[in-house]
């Protein structure tokens, strides 16, 4: 299996990207091509077995306007990576770089699955039982129509079943209440569509319950999803910051901290994004994974593993076939 990776994307690139790639080729049956500045990549590449470098000095930064950058910076590492997938030189691609640029490259270079109107950015987030849940969309498109939410639900359900190995994954619609008929025009119409869709729809779910594992897939528009995602991230960071401040406030609390250090470490691991890989851009013609901007080697490794599983378990072909079959039923 061939994977293309933007070696220059992310806060800790290229070092952590290279380290994650080396870990992956040691443990997974993959061949990796790193796109980026060879002079910066090579010092970290101590084992180049099954890893090749395509040199380019052009990079899309976080300050670049996404669409313009993808169209003008033809030799940027992120664009060359996406082109490799388009030209069938790679089966999937991964970047921890500019999210908007990756979405633009996904749309304009890799292309959409026929019948999918808009791709969805879809991370797996932690739950208290450690199983996690998939949420989509978290920002690929701030606006959505009921049909888009239906497509998100189908794609999320297929991914959860094939990659996360959840039989009959529970799909919930993010809303302001759990009762039928709650919400705005979008959620009311989407609710009706989801009820008749070939998925295990469990109804409306509230944001306060999603970390408790109320659903395996949570569907929402990109605006609400992004707000929910940032709230979860911010709340987790704040809790750990407050906890650290309290435990370090006196000799007594420092002694207590020493006693529960291992347990707190386990709690932090449970909430660690790096264990879940990256956010898939579902709806594209091939797997495209957005790794977190602050990804370390472990997060990159898990994003590579995630991309490998998406290819192995034929997530994209299954989405394509399902959307096509639904389209035929609607035509009849």
Swiss-Prot record:
Please classify the protein's predominant subcellular localization into one broad category: cytoplasm
**Alphabetized Gene3D superfamilies for the sequence:** Isopropylmalate Dehydrogenase
Q: Which Pfam families match?
A: FA_synthesis (PF02504)
Q: Which reaction does it catalyse?
A: a fatty acyl-[ACP] + phosphate = an acyl phosphate + holo-[ACP]
Q: Which UniProt keywords apply?
A: Cytoplasm, Lipid biosynthesis, Lipid metabolism, Phospholipid biosynthesis, Phospholipid metabolism, Transferase
User: Can you name a GO cellular component term?
Assistant: cytoplasm
SUPFAM superfamilies tied to this protein: Isocitrate/Isopropylmalate dehydrogenase-like
Q: Which InterPro entries match?
A: FA_synthesis, Phospholipid_synth_PlsX-like
What Gene Ontology biological process does one annotation of this record name? Answer: fatty acid biosynthetic process
Q: Does the keyword Endoplasmic reticulum apply?
A: no
Where is it localised? Cytoplasm
Gene Ontology MF: a single term: phosphate:acyl-[acyl carrier protein] acyltransferase activity
E.C. code: 2.3.1.274
Listed pathway(s)? Lipid metabolism; phospholipid metabolism
Protein function: Catalyzes the reversible formation of acyl-phosphate (acyl-PO(4)) from acyl-[acyl-carrier-protein] (acyl-ACP). This enzyme utilizes acyl-ACP as fatty acyl donor, but not acyl-CoA.
Hey, which family's this protein in?
Belongs to the PlsX family.
Oligomeric state and partners? Homodimer. Probably interacts with PlsY.
Instruction: Spell out the protein name for this chain.
Output: Phosphate acyltransferase
């Amino acid at each position: 299996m061939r994977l293309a990776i933007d070696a220059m994307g992310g806060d800790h690139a290229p070092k952590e990207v290279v380290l994650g790639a080396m870990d992956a080729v040691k443990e997974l049956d993959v061949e990796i091509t790193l796109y980026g500045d060879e002079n910066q990549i090579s010092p970290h590449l101590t084992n180049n077995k099954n890893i090749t470098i395509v040199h380019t000095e052009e990079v899309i930064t976080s300050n670049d306007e996404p669409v313009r950058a993808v169209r003008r910076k033809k030799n940027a590492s992120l664009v060359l990576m996406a082109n490799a997938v388009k030209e069938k030189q790679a089966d999937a691609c991964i970047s921890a770089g500019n999210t908007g640029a990756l979405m633009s490259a996904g749309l304009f270079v890799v292309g959409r699955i026929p019948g999918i109107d808009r791709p969805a950015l879809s991370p797996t987030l932690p739950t208290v039982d450690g199983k996690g849940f998939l949420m989509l969309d978290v920002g690929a498109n701030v606006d959505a129509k009921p049909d888009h939410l239906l497509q998100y639900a189908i794609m999320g359900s297929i991914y959860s079943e094939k990659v996360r190995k959840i039989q009959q994954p529970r799909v919930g619609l993010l809303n302001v209440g759990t009762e039928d008929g709650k919400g705005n025009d979008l959620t009311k119409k989407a609710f009706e569509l989801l009820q008749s869709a070939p998925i295990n729809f469990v109804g409306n779910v509230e944001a306060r319950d999603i970390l408790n594992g109320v659903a395996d897939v949570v569907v929402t528009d990109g605006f609400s999803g992004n707000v929910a995602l940032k709230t979860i991230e911010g709340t987790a960071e704040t809790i750990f910051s407050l906890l650290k401040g309290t435990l370090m406030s006196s000799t007594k609390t420092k002694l207590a901290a020493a006693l529960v250090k291992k347990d707190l470490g386990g709690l932090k691991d449970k909430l660690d994004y790096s264990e879940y890989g990256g956010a898939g851009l579902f709806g594209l013609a091939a797997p495209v994974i957005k790794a977190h901007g602050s990804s370390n080697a472990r997060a990159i490794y898990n994003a590579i593993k995630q991309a490998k599983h998406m290819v192995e378990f034929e997530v994209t072909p299954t989405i394509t076939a399902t959307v096509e079959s639904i389209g035929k039923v609607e035509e009849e």
